[in-house]
Design a protein with these regions (language model features):
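Conserved, non-catalytic sequence blocks in retroelement Pol enzymes and Pol-derived host proteins
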Residues: 6, 37-43, 62-66, 83, ...
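Basic, short loop/linker segments at the boundary and entry of helix-turn-helix/winged-helix-like folds
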Residues: 1-22, 38-48, 117
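Acidic/histidine-rich catalytic cores and adjacent linkers
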Residues: 155, 188-308
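Electropositive nucleic-acid engagement tracts
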Residues: 24-71
Length: 308
């Protein structure tokens, strides 16, 4: 590390990019560099340096992808962006996949405010244009029109409602004093050994709580067709599908961006920060998922001729 007041600035650009990836504004970075190195770096210079990865970002967003991914997750993180003096709420849609080797990979990041079926068809068609021919399971929250779009883009693909978000949405209706007990009751549904057993638990949980929280369980019945696919899988496969450690590790990094700055100056500034944060997080993703050999073996049996 360069000591304070030392004039050797080798590595300073990488330091600036690293600070930007942590969510610092150009002003905060300028102040930090002055504190560490003892000389001023203008906001404009910081901005120029953080613009340098833009060609890499474009290449990354357009890079060829594998032909087949066993599991793909779609997640959204929300940010505020300034546009002509107005503050817009935008979502960053992160497409995360598990490859045939069991490694996690961020396929793309899309920034937008439109969640229409047309928007999602464009997102999935972009994956196809980059080489993806098949996905076994897509896990997503209740995104508008996603079911119809998945059927159109990847007709053989199974849509699985994200269990973690289903649970979170349910618990929004529940009082603080009952959240823990209610959450444990919900586990009896999605940990059930079969769909038949899960439906019995669904009825039991609904009857137990409907007097106090009449709206809490409605979405389970409404979304059952996209919740229920998980019950045909073993515990190993289920764990991959409803354990969102990879998504959560990404989100924790993205949330740091929101903590550091409440508003991004532009869509480009947000995309730069997301890409650089993603790069830092995914550098640690060197190992395949636990028990991936067993998971892949089961998927090959359940989806014959689609993983070869």
């Amino acid at each position: 590390m360069v000591k304070k007041r030392q004039k050797d600035i080798s590595g300073i650009e990488q330091k600036i990019i690293s600070l930007y990836a942590k969510g610092m504004t150009t002003r905060q970075i300028s102040d930090t560099i002055e504190e560490i190195y003892g000389f001023e770096v203008s906001d404009g210079m910081v901005s120029d340096i953080t613009d340098r990865p833009l060609p890499q970002i474009e290449d990354w967003q357009n890079r060829p992808l594998d032909e087949v991914y066993p599991i793909v997750f779609i997640d959204a993180v929300h940010f505020s962006v300034r546009d002509n003096g107005q503050i817009r709420k935008l979502a960053a849609y992160v497409i995360l996949a598990v490859s045939l080797t069991g490694h996690k990979e961020v396929l793309s990041i899309h920034i937008g405010e439109d969640e229409s079926a047309k928007y999602w068809l464009g997102v999935l068609n972009e994956l196809k244009n980059r080489g993806v021919k098949d996905v076994l399971v897509i896990c997503a929250d209740g995104l508008s029109g996603i079911k119809e779009v998945v059927n159109a883009a990847f007709p053989q693909t199974e849509l699985q409602r994200c269990i973690v978000y289903q649970v979170r949405n349910t618990l929004k209706y529940v009082g603080a004093k009952n959240k823990k007990e209610f959450a444990n009751d919900l586990k009896t549904i999605y940990h059930a050994p079969s769909e038949e057993a899960a439906l019995k638990q669904l009825e039991r949980v609904t009857e137990k709580w409907e007097k106090d929280y009449p709206n809490a369980m409605k979405s389970w019945y409404k979304n059952w067709d996209v919740i229920s696919p998980i019950f045909k899988f073993s515990a190993d496969v289920r764990k991959v599908i409803y354990t969102t450690n990879a998504i959560e590790s990404l989100n924790s990094g993205y949330r740091r961006l929101n903590k550091q700055r409440s508003v991004f100056t532009s869509d480009t500034a947000l995309l730069k920060a997301l890409y650089l944060a993603t790069h830092e997080i995914t550098k640690k993703w060197t190992m395949p998922l636990r028990n991936w050999g067993r998971v892949l073996g089961e998927l090959e049996i359940m989806y014959p001729d689609r993983l070869s």
